[in-house]
Amino acid sequence: SGKGGRGLMAQAVELNGKKILVTFLMHLGDLTLTTPFIHALRKAAPDAHITFLADEKLKDVVLHNPYLDEVITIDKKGKDNSLLALMACARRLSKMDFDVLINLHPNERCSFIDAFTKVKLRCGTTHTMFKPLWDVFTPLNRKIHAADMYLDVLTQLGVKKLEHNGLEIFPSEEY
């Protein structure tokens, strides 16, 4: 199809020096598989401010990641498990004035929040119903390993060199 919402797929996006919001509200194993993406994003955009939206119950997977500047959480199965709560989350995120939003998974909850968050550039993947709102849509290649699939989003956004150390876990100082 070639078209994805308001923009084209595989469009180079300026990431360095930008306020970037990465959204991912999936399960523990899936979240761990985003760590190469986070590292590669930081290497590609060393001067960016990178914020990550994750599920409250899984925040420890990303909380101490040195490649992130900030982690924001929602309690997706608890207090934030309603459309009103998701809209409130989108309003909170909108006030943070992000330049670029990158969604890594097309689940409905994350796609809904992303669709209603005011940002300058919305990219990555999304649920089909929200695709017309995306500036740069990056389809997920489900024929490759999930960690590589998330890295491929950066390739589609024009990142030429994907530097990372594979899967990484950064425990708190207590460990």
Model-derived regions: residue spans:
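Catalytic machinery of carbohydrate-active enzymes
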Residues: 1-175
